[in-house]
Amino acid sequence: EAKRKEDESIDLIVTSIPFSNHYEYTPSYNDFGHTDNNRHFWAQMDFLTPELLRILRPGRLACIHVKDRILFGNVTGAGVPTVSPFHAEGIFHYLSHGFDYMGMVTVVTDVVRENNQTYRLGWSEQCKDGTKMGVGSPEYVLLFRKPQTDRTRGYADVPVEKDKTNYTRARWQIDAHAFWRSSGDRLLSAKELEGYGPDEMGQRFRDLSRSAIYNYAQHVAIGESLERKGKLPGTFMAIAPGSHAEDVWDDVVRMRTLNTDQVQKGREAHVCPLPFDIVDRLINRYSNKGELVYDPFAGLMTVPYRAILLGRRGGGSELSEDYFKDGLRYLD
């Protein structure tokens, strides 16, 4: 479908590409998930990526959501879980096809929930031998730019402009700075946190950890105190630290996806839905109102759906007939 599109007809690409052969999204031979390994997957992407470069306007961005893959020791023969650096492979793949690499946004994930899915970060195993333990696997948004026509100037052929009355100098200086200054406010104590439910507890702890000077020992002490009182959940991380860096997003709401509506309506849930938060931020930052935002792996049409709500036009391609039909219902 990308091959059918006109040259330079897309203003922004936002997509979550298949994670190699980690998932099989549809029972179709054409599914990108039906590949032997990473090398085979990227060989298939070699057919799509040049088309994405062709249809994108000069100077505009392709925002690629990816996640590293966990490799299990009993499969690889390593004996311990290791990590396949899928995001790094993605960087070099898109560079090889002519995109300029603009950087990477890190989206923090919950290590407790991750362990419940992969069993590679278990507390008991950590206590037996810490050397076999890595860290949680965040998600990444890789930012690639199609070179602008005039390489002597940095501007896109059609810039994404901001109105200075709404987007002030002060706001930009804060946005552009890598870290936020501390107000000196202290963290809440475990006793103060006990009165909140798990959801509100997590939000308050994250907000306060952004504004106060971080204290690792105090963070651990709060968690231990909550655990002694039976207040520390074992299925998700209730007191995750907040991020000061603009390129590390700690507040993505995992429940805000079209899968929530799918489940409520008794329809098939997507195996890997994009949260609204990620999509909205990318659309607002990298496109103008009225422009066309495209997702070549549209799934439930999250990207075109959010684009329309944000005053843009949306387009997407999807192999699964069921996902496609459900996506049309959201767009209707």
Regions flagged by a language model, labelled:
Residues 45, 331-332:
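Conserved phosphoryl-transfer catalytic core
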Residues 1-326:
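Core catalytic lobe of class I
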